[in-house]
Structure formats: structure tokens, C-alpha cells
């Protein structure tokens, strides 16, 4: 059993960000947690990196890693991996969403 936390992983929207606005306690908390050598801070979000920075401000620099765009972009330290969807898969999803009358938001994922 772990005697102390080894990491903080949080979603943003609907968890600590509501209506596009982060709880004012979030950035100071992330900085404090990241300042400890025994804790890694990671954000998992559907947002692109620029959207993450919009709500976290300069606190984004204290993150050890991030999972952005629902897993299509992974960052850990200075390493980055991208898992783009094929265009034909995107078209299938978009077509199905429109046929079902579902709202749809697509992000190209550039930083």
C-alpha cells in the first residue's frame, strides 16, 4: 500500500473547470503539488494544448505531462507522441453525428 500520493491526474472540463473557467484554487494547488519531488502532476483532457493553457495559465508549465485531445496527443516532459485519426475515420464519425442530429466539435490539435 502506498503511504503517500505519487501523482495527481485530473480532467479539466466538468471536473475542475466549469464554463471555461478554472476554480481559482486550481493553479496554486497544481504548483504546490508539482513542487514536491514525490508527486507528478498530469492533466488529461479533450482540449488541445492551447486550450489547456487558456484555463491553466502559466500553471501549465508545472505539469509533468498531459494527455490531450482525448489521447491523440501525449506529452511527458519534453517527449511527445501523436496518434492522429485517419481522415476516412473522421469523415465516418462526422457523417454519423450529423445524421443523428448530434452537436459536434472538432479540433485539429495544433498547439
Predicted region positions:
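Asp-based phosphoryl-transfer active-site loop
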Residues: 2-22, 43
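Short, flexible hinge/linker loops that cap or flank conserved catalytic cores
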Residues: 1-2, 35
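Active-site phosphate-binding/coordination module
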Residues: 24-111
